[in-house]
Amino acid sequence: MDLKTAVFNAARDGKLRLLTKLLASKSKEEVSSLISEKTNGATPLLMAARYGHLDMVEFLLEQCSASIEVGGSVNFDGETIEGAPPLWAASAAGHLKVVQSLLNHGASVNNTTLTNSTPLRAACFDGHLEIVKYLVEHKADLEVSNRHGHTCLMISCYKGHKEIAQYLLEKGADVNRKSVKGNTALHDCAESGSLDIMKMLLMYCAKMEKDGYGMTPLLSASVTGHTNIVDFLTHHAQTSKTERINALELLGATFVDKKRDLLGALKYWKKAMNMRYSDRTNIISKPVPQTLIMAYDYAKEVNSAEELEGLIADPDEMRMQALLIRERILGPSHPDTSYYIRYRGAVYADSGNFKRCINLWKYALDMQQNNLDPLSPMTASSLLSFAELFSFMLQDRAKGLLGTTVTFDDLMGILCKSVLEIERAIKQTQCPADPLQLNKALSIILHLICLLEKVPCTLEQDHFKKQTIYRFLKLHPRGKNNFSPLHLAVDKNTTCVGRYPVCKFPSLQVTAILIECGADVNVRDSDDNSPLHIAALNNHPDIMNLLIKSGAHFDATNLHKQTASDLLDEKEIAKNLIQPINHTTLQCLAARVIVNHRIYYKGHIPEKLETFVSLHR
């Protein structure tokens, strides 16, 4: 173990005597260097503060001149917090004496993590009341929010820490402050079921506001299934009759899909129906749908007590009612609307009803693409679920276990929607696509193409498939490391796209159809690797030969002056199957001489040849 690691471990474990021995013979400069070094993203002081070693913290500050503000990586409950200062770590872990010492040594009380979380927020999160009080007494700012606009009061409400919430309110915390998504502390109480704190907030004049999705605290409670909050707020003076009805109907939908309690759902739906008809002079009818939805099996919402009673005998119809109600009240842009449509589809798939599953998932995907930003993780999750489902169906069909088949139209429809997602992302020039999400979407498309190659099709369908792939390639999308679709097709890492296996990569079939549809075989990634280089790294001679036959330049070099041949594993058979002499021309040899001898050629040879020579640099 090296000295740096030994020093780090001693600080983390609170072994002060060991640390003093390790540093005894070191100069001031050496000590300063060792104490400022990070191991796994954290300094010795940060670890000592995290684990509450007061004597170690004071030794590092007073004897070693450790920097009191330098942040780093700390782990809490399996989550890594980046850029956490020592005071934040001590506050989060509940070490009051360490917090006091750090502040006495001049630590900034409002220094934040990378996500803008303050030490006060950290203490509020885990309910450390004494630390909260101490920090506030030392001028901690109550209103500094994290990057989501979530305040200390909000997190105290969400975590159910009533005493902390009360203390913050007494100290003047803004009870009606809104987060980036527009939710308030009342929403946090509703989502966590903290009824006592909610009552306290209302005493401090909290207002029933809507968040960015149009959700009131009452609807938030209905979505999360907190009946205590729903019962309280439906009797509150600020709640209108229509709001009460919607809340009860939505709560019933939550009972169907989240709690799987159909009788409980009926109870709340009956309550809501009685409210609709309670005033015979002003009956509140449900809106008449403009069209019936095929994905919901053309179901329509019940509109009378008699129709509601009829649902008891038809659990499947009840489940469709839940989806209809949720879509009507929350709207298509709320994440829960599409989430539960997908959930219901997955339940159908588990029971072997793949057609119903596909119809529901397609409907949810359309909803997501119409309402979410391009390459939203939720949309990517939907596309991946389709790929996994189709893969499963094709495998089982091959075993003769299923009567259901994957149709070309089903697969092709999802491929088209996947390509549309890439188009949407690339057109959005003001906000560049997240490289990781783009890479995932590209990988999913390649898996769908791979699956399509296993499904029989007519000549007309084959033409449409290739036309779509051509359109996809013409977008020139790039994933991580600036990988093109062809790079991804020849890389084994493309196999790992989700939890369940879909297709195996490198894929000769996918590579072949990409080349046929116009993929550039000499395209480069961020390290100047061509697809041939990546195929060589993956030791796939068949793909390498296909790329070479299709015009890939065999002795083109990457950023590290390596050819594809240099990257082949000496132990693998591919090294013997690919013979450089068979693919090297006199033109290549001449280009190498120009590059190796640094002969100036630009402007002296045709542009086409300049490009050719540059391949050998």
From Swiss-Prot:
GO term, biological process aspect, one: ubiquitin-dependent protein catabolic process via the C-end degron rule pathway
InterPro entries for the chain: Ankyrin_rpt (IPR002110), Ankyrin_rpt-contain_sf (IPR036770), TPR-like_helical_dom_sf (IPR011990)
Repeat region (TPR), residues: 245-279, 338-371
CC per GO annotation: Cul2-RING ubiquitin ligase complex; cytosol; nucleoplasm; ubiquitin ligase complex
ANK repeat placement: 2-31, 40-70, 82-111, 115-144, 148-177, 181-210, 213-242, 481-523, 527-556
SMART domains: ANK
MF annotations from Gene Ontology: ubiquitin-like ligase-substrate adaptor activity
SUPFAM superfamilies attached to this UniProt entry: Ankyrin repeat
Top-level division of the source organism's lineage: Eukaryota
Biochemical pathway: Protein modification; protein ubiquitination
Modified residues (N-acetylmethionine): 1
Coiled-coil residues: none
Keywords, sorted A to Z: Acetylation, ANK repeat, Repeat, TPR repeat, Ubl conjugation pathway
Membership in a protein family: Belongs to the fem-1 family.
Record's comment describing the protein's domains: The first seven ANK repeats at the N-terminus (1-242) are essnetial for recognition of Lys/Arg-Xaa-Arg and -Lys/Arg-Xaa-Xaa-Arg C-degrons.
Role this protein plays: Substrate-recognition component of a Cul2-RING (CRL2) E3 ubiquitin-protein ligase complex of the DesCEND (destruction via C-end degrons) pathway, which recognizes a C-degron located at the extreme C terminus of target proteins, leading to their ubiquitination and degradation. The C-degron recognized by the DesCEND pathway is usually a motif of less than ten residues and can be present in full-length proteins, truncated proteins or proteolytically cleaved forms.
Assembly, per entry: Component of a CRL2 E3 ubiquitin-protein ligase complex, also named ECS (Elongin BC-CUL2/5-SOCS-box protein) complex, composed of CUL2, Elongin BC (ELOB and ELOC), RBX1 and substrate-specific adapter FEM1C.
Name of this chain's protein: Protein fem-1 homolog C
Species of provenance: Bos taurus
Gene name of the record: FEM1C
